């Protein structure tokens, strides 16, 4: 029988993002997923494929700015496109526009491709696409490229004080 010495073992440190710490603190059950990545973001459909997950459950987090200078967060399935007119209507604005990529970190505290609806610098009004109400789990960024979490949609909606609306293009 072979003897394995502890000092010969390499242990991988489990990554805990701020999003996971928030979920732990709130005692919300979640599953942590990792996918292979470089330093840059990849599109959400690729992320779903890399994790072997149904793209209907994998959502991306997009940040917009309204006419009145307020920021809004929209969370939609990765294979759908945001409808800015529907988004504006859902938050009571005349119009909203996507924030420039260069402003993502300044506004949210996250980088492009690692933006989570949970744990941003400030709590912004958050709207989920209506499909979030009828799926068994939702998968979103854990706040770092290469890391995703899946949890019950109702838990995520509650923690973000979110609402649901039809916010994607037909």
Spans of model-derived segments:
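Extended, low-hydrophobicity, polar/charged segments
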Residues: 2-170
């Amino acid at each position: 029988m072979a003897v394995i010495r502890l000092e010969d073992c390499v242990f991988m440190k489990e990554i805990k993002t701020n999003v996971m710490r928030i979920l732990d603190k709130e005692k919300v059950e979640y599953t942590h997923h990792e996918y292979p990545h470089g330093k840059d973001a990849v599109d959400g459909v690729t992320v779903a494929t890399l994790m072997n997950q149904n793209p209907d459950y994998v959502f991306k987090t997009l940040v917009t700015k309204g006419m009145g200078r307020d920021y809004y967060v929209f969370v939609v399935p990765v294979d759908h496109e945001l409808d800015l007119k529907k988004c504006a209507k859902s938050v009571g604005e005349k119009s909203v526009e996507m924030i420039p990529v260069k402003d993502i970190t300044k506004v949210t505290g996250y980088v492009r491709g690692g933006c989570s609806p949970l744990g941003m610098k400030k709590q912004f009004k958050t709207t989920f696409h209506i499909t979030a109400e009828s799926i068994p789990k939702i998968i979103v960024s854990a706040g770092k490229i290469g890391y995703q979490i899946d949890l019950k949609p109702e838990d995520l909606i509650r923690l973000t004080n979110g609402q649901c609306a039809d916010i994607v293009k037909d």
